[in-house]
Amino acid sequence: MVAIPRLARLSVPAWALSARGRFYATVSTPQTLVEKIVQKYAVGLSEGVKVRAGDYVMIKPEHVMTHDNTGPVISKFLSLSCSKLDNPRQPVFALDHDVQNQSETNQKKYKKIQAFAKEHGVDFYPAGRGIGHQIIVEEGYAWPGKMVVASDSHSNHYGGVGCLGTAIVRTDAAGIWATGKFWWQIPRIVSVSLDGRLSPGVTGKDVIVALAGLFNKDEVLNAAIEFTGSGVEHLSIDERLTIANMTTEWGAVAGVFPVDDKLKEWYQGILRKAELRKFISPTVPSTVGAKVHPRLNAARLDDAMTNRVVADPGAHYAARLSLDLSTLVPHVSGPNSVKVATALPKLLDPPIPINKAYLVSCTNSRASDIASAAQVLRGKKVAPGVEFYIAAASSRVQEDAEAAGDWQTLIDAGAKTLPAGCGPCIGLGVGLLEKGEVGISATNRNYKGRMGSPDAIAYLASPAVVAASAAKGVICGPESMDLSQLPQYEQPKFSIIEEGAAGEEKPVEVDEASLEPLLEGFPAYFEGPLLFAPQDNLTTDGMYPGKYTYQDDITPERQAEVVMENYDPTFAATARELRTALPTASSPSTLPGAILLSGYNFGTGSSREQAATAIKNAGIPLVICGSFGDIFKRNSINNGLILIESPSLIKDMTERFAKDGVRNKGGKDGKLTVVPEGWRIKVDSQRGLVTVNMGEEEEKTYPAAKVGRSVQELWVNGGLEGFIRASL
């Protein structure tokens, strides 16, 4: 608990500068790699302000990719009365998910998207060209030191080439088309040091499978990861892409590798190939017949390598994780969970029979992956009773694999080919797992029902292990793998240091003169009684039951009546009582209203935006938690519900009011929602302070993340749609 005197200069603990408790940054504040990239793309900042983890910022990304979901984004864009794109060079359309679907309905949808791209001059890649994430890297949209977003959860993929990639929702994509920008809260940043060197037969896929299994207690949940360490230089770029891609399954919102000489050499190879081709976009006349690629060219590469973006010495990280690569053996993820990772040797006895094997997806279907599988299967056949499906990450990858002879090797072994696209990875098309079947895949997700029947079992592994398993009919490694030569450790060596919880309270000077002014119309203070739901991982279904989700005619008043129904049936009545008893605001700049407090990962689960609007309609203008689910956060702020993170406040509330001093058991009084009698809470929007008035007890003030200017802009315009209309 931190008591902060009300002085012109405030003294707070050093840990309050972490992702959830920072007040502001000064010119001299060291920045991480992620913060530096965001700094380049943040717009509307006051002069001299440096962004930090926890800040809400308005971002103008280099590019935004949409895939088959471009159709709904077009509908949202048109519903905003938009007639033209803010910057036609910013969006990229790549059709990749349902490419096996030749139905009239799907083909009509694809043609509509292509026509929209042609009308507005947007780069368009048709079905069969490849998976969007592969294309974004392959065609140079993702680039070292840049920031690229996509309406797909595996946008983390771009971090493999030193590009900050993160996912957005469809409404954000429409907003970017219209205004060129979107809001983002810079996540807490975790450093992951990969040390040593992998043994022969161990791959980048084994690295990320092991990381997700070893650090499976939400250590990187909703964080941005920066990979460092001596082992990075020994990882191929394809391996880095695999690792970055699956940081999504690990729980992170981004995973970025450094820009180094190995990346430079890789791009030089790409450029040599590019010189042999002409560059034709089917929708952009300016590139037709061009001799120099608009993105993949020597001048651009020289600029990226000369002006490399690197973290500052002394930059702050919420945590530091490490993994000794030299102690790692091949690992398998599952069954049906990426949080379960087992060393391959432990799965050999008793053998695990399989029915299907897959070498598909943006995770592991590049030319090097196909070559690895071909090396295992050369001269062999897929085992009787096993179906082995292959699909290249892109048509260009398939061309390279065909030229090398690897594609034909897999076909000769009995592999069944699929078009370049997502296919079985997303549970679409032929070859899905059926009830009772077991599959092993080089993809990124093995959640129950993801690749077919919910009554099937799915494992994840490297391309070599998948190919070997297809040949043997059981999960195994290649014949060339000598288990006795692998590192002999019970488990890989790893460690974690939580910097944010270090507890060393060095005073930090915060100058009032450096505070940014609030936008006109945004409340300087939020004030009112508090409700505390002592629960972690409170789902959106708990906030707004699924049975109401598709009642499109439901009123705001009715939403308020059912809010939190699945968590606490009495919550709505409690909130109504507090709302009707609210006193007059203490000042014109104060917005009165009950304030909801809860635990960590508040709003996990379904993406239903009614979870946010129901809370707001219940008269709760602001929610304070330890952390929030990322999609819930976006839905809330897009609809004008303010969210603030203050771990220290939640810690004290838990100790005082939660049963047994821990969350997830309800309150000490037996109620699921605690309303401390006589207590009031006041949030200072500009300073990032939360003051709790405990009735007859002393006031306590806690650090919290400030309400950023980007969030203020949305709020004063009534939400994202109002902001977009005001920006046109």
From Swiss-Prot:
Pathway(s) the chain acts in: Amino-acid biosynthesis; L-lysine biosynthesis via AAA pathway; L-alpha-aminoadipate from 2-oxoglutarate: step 3/5
Enzyme Commission (EC) number: 4.2.1.36
Pfam families: Aconitase, Aconitase_C
Cofactor(s) listed in the protein's UniProt record: [4Fe-4S] cluster
Binding locations of [4Fe-4S] cluster: C362, C422, C425
Free-text remark on how the cofactor is bound: Binds 1 [4Fe-4S] cluster per subunit.
GO MF, any single term: metal ion binding
Classification via InterPro entries: Acnase/IPM_dHydase_lsu_aba_1/3, Acoase/IPM_deHydtase_lsu_aba, Aconitase/3IPM_dehydase_swvl, Aconitase_4Fe-4S_BS, Aconitase_4Fe-4S_dom, AconitaseA/IPMdHydase_ssu_swvl, Homoaconitase_mito, IPM_dehydratase_rel_enz
Gene3D superfamilies assigned: Aconitase, domain 3, Aconitase, domain 4
Subcellular localization: Mitochondrion
GO BP: lysine biosynthetic process via aminoadipic acid
Free-text function comment from the UniProt entry: Catalyzes the reversible hydration of cis-homoaconitate to (2R,3S)-homoisocitrate, a step in the alpha-aminoadipate pathway for lysine biosynthesis.
NCBIfam families in alphabetical order: h_aconitase
Protein name in the entry: Homoaconitase, mitochondrial
